[in-house]
Amino acid sequence: MTGNEIRSRFLKFFQDHGHTVVPSSALIPHNDPTLLFINAGMNQFKDVFLGREKRDYVRATSAQKCVRAGGKHNDLENVGQTARHHTFFEMLGNFSFGDYFKKEAIDHAWKFLTEEMGLPKDKLWVTVFREDDEAYDIWRDQQGIPEERLIRMGEKDNFWSMGDTGPCGPCSEILIDQGESMSCGDECGIGKCDCDRYLELWNLVFMQFNRDADGTMTPLPKPSIDTGMGLERITAVMQGVQSNYDCDLLRGIIAHVEELSGKRYGDNAEHDMSMRVIADHSRATAFLIADGVLPSNEGRGYVLRRIMRRAARHAKMLGFADPVLYRTATFVLQSMAEAYPEPAQRADYVAKIVKIEEERFIQTLDNGLRILTEEVERLKAANATVLPGDVAFKLYDTFGFPLDLTADILRGENVTIDEDGFEACMEEQRQKAREHWKGSGEEAISGIYRQLAEEGARTDFTGYGELTGQSEILAILLDGQPVSSAPAGAKVEIVTAATPFYGESGGQTGDCGTLAAGDAEVTITDTKKPLPELFVHVGEIAAGTLQTGETATLTVDRERRQATALNHTATHLLQAALVEVLGEHVKQAGSLVTPERLRFDFIHFSAMSAEELERVETLVNCRIRENAGVDTREMDHEQAVAEGATALFGEKYGDKVRVVRVGDISMELCGGTHANASGDIGLFKILQETGIAAGVRRIEAVTGAKALQVVRDQERTLDDLASLIKTDRPQLEARLRKLLERQKELEREIESLQGKLNADQAGDLLQQATEIDGISVVCGRVDNLDGKALRELADQVRDRLSSGVLILGSAHEGKAGLLVAVTKDLTKRLQAGALVKQLAAMVGGGGGGRPDLAQAGGSKPEQLDEALASVPQRISEALNAA
């Protein structure tokens, strides 16, 4: 039975038992800052379990993509070394939201394993929480598990909680006895060791309590079920193999690596490990990028980069000199297309991103490995086993070696890293990372918003059709804490039952305006949307006292809203134009829409040419002039996608979505505010196009009055330039070309004159030559010559000096310049680089070069004479030392 068949039969089994099959969510958690990646099947149902979200089903089943690499669940360093560790895996699960409980959950699991999968009952063992008599009795009496195979365990192994507070409950694990051959010895047993004889297959979590902050647990009115079973693990068991890497889900990727490398799996232990690493990391890489993560130096992108670079290093160990991971990542998506068709459609995009990252790392990998090898040899010579933290930091900062990659390489040399020293070097970067991922204060405020939502606060948005409205004030936050009233001058956050103010989301900034209630007047400077149905107005009380329970009049700043709406519609037109000009691979990777300007990030693999930018700008303006109507409506998500609506990479959408259509030009899923017609935008002007990450470009642009102002500023600049060179705007280009041609002519004349001057100066310098220990020495000061001019003069002197040493000094534009030249026959006795360093130190600078020619600069031209006066003594000392 293949892994694909097991996945299908699992979902079909639970569908036949009244469960709704829910597709896997993206690997990027939606609206959950506490989670780096989706790492369990229940993640996408978290708000349902917490009662914050209602679904139209009470039973669900899924096969969920998961990644564990970073944070609490970090399996990265073990991947490839063991039979079970993965960064990417699939979790099969069934869930009940207040519907069935232990009896049905246990029965479903037992029937699937013993009847659907045909596993022998006498090989299955079960653990329960030591105090969960109910589950124990169900297993024993309902399923007939003998007590010798029914084990009570403690809280560490068999009690699950979502956090320090909230839903929690006992769990029950189903294990399979794989036989004596898998035993670790006489002490082998459940709860006694971690070997694979008794292999955990399925964990059934019974959410039946709510834990308070003081630790008190009270029964939930509607207990729920959350179960999880690793697809790779059950597939390995069903296929009778002892390692997950030998099941067909991963063995096919390993076979592909065998084909590419020309090496056979099983012939060499080190090569086998590298193949396992590449197989696993290719899956994580492919699906993370397909879901919108890009390699970077922070957050999720840095975890992805660590995974990719570890895989690249193992590819090198297999003998690959050129990029190869882009090929294995493509193979992964194509081979898993039946289960995950959408990521497979992005295979070309994924391959390009992976190849770019691989090429960048390969350029520095050899240099980094050389430095690391030298350090290891030095440590061995000193009988030391700890790599200094600053060396590990240099490898990270200069050569892009993540710390765990360095540790991975050193493990085979029995060398560890001074992690405290590394952390000290990383302090500045760590501080930036903390700011990026938000501090505990912001997390606490986020908790306040959730608390308000749990207490029933929610906001209806009325701002699509109106810019004013009245509503009750539900909550006031002062310094992040709820208060019943706030005085004039206070900076507050206000939650109302309804609002016309748009809350920042989807890249569009929040509205500004005013709020009035009783005698209070509030200036609203921003509107946030921390939760899907909670709008928070940020502002300062200008007068009076604001109180909860009052009816407020809310008025949106019409001009700002209109400008923002125009920019948002222009962003949709821009995306459509980019697709038309650059190709279908263009996808939105982010955006920012403000009243002043718009910013659009998109997938593309090279800088846009001036011609491409002009075509895009022209196309957008053509569509503005078409004055196409902008239509918005709600529809089923599936229908919108079927009709061709564009969605944002990795974004989570509900069953109902809002679709914004601009004529026949653009159709996108979007919750933002828009113009009534494209003609309202007036004018579109691109300000700049830049690269922000591998395969991601950014365009910044303005519209309407702002665009007109940019054009006027450009015209004014042209007029000023024309006036400066005494012409008019129509003749500006021709006049500039003539000036540039004249400049080149003058430069050639100057160069010719300089050559003649150099010849004269060279003659004068040669006449001043002295002899030191039998060597001819020419030393002189020639001011107002830059570095290039000094070299040209030196060439003239050397051509006429058959054997000797030349030293030149020049004061130029407030700096000191030095040049030392030594004829080839003398370089074994006297080196130009050594002499110029000594002289440069006297003029407050430094420099160097070849044994026969070296230059230096300094900040103290007033010391030049003293430096040149020291030349005879320095040459004499150098000759005597030789």
From Swiss-Prot:
It comes from the Bacteria. InterPro entries: aa-tRNA-synth_II/BPL/LPL (IPR045864), Ala-tRNA-lgiase_IIc (IPR002318), Ala-tRNA-ligase_IIc_anticod-bd (IPR018162), Ala-tRNA-synth_IIc_core (IPR018165), Ala-tRNA-synth_IIc_N (IPR018164), Ala-tRNA_ligase (IPR050058), Ala_tRNA_ligase_euk/bac (IPR023033), DHHA1_dom (IPR003156). Gene3D superfamilies: 2.40.30.130, 3.10.310.40, 3.30.54.20, 6.10.250.550, Bira Bifunctional Protein, Domain 2 (3.30.930.10), Threonyl-trna Synthetase, Chain A, domain 2 (3.30.980.10). Its EC number is 6.1.1.7. SMART domains: tRNA_SAD (SM00863). Zn(2+) binds at H568, H572, C670, H674. Its main location: cytoplasm. CDD domains: AlaRS_core. Consists of three domains; the N-terminal catalytic domain, the editing domain and the C-terminal C-Ala domain. The editing domain removes incorrectly charged amino acids, while the C-Ala domain, along with tRNA(Ala), serves as a bridge to cooperatively bring together the editing and aminoacylation centers thus stimulating deacylation of misacylated tRNAs. This is Alanine--tRNA ligase. It comes from Syntrophotalea carbinolica (strain DSM 2380 / NBRC 103641 / GraBd1) (Pelobacter carbinolicus). The lineage of its organism: Bacteria, Pseudomonadati, Thermodesulfobacteriota, Desulfuromonadia, Desulfuromonadales.
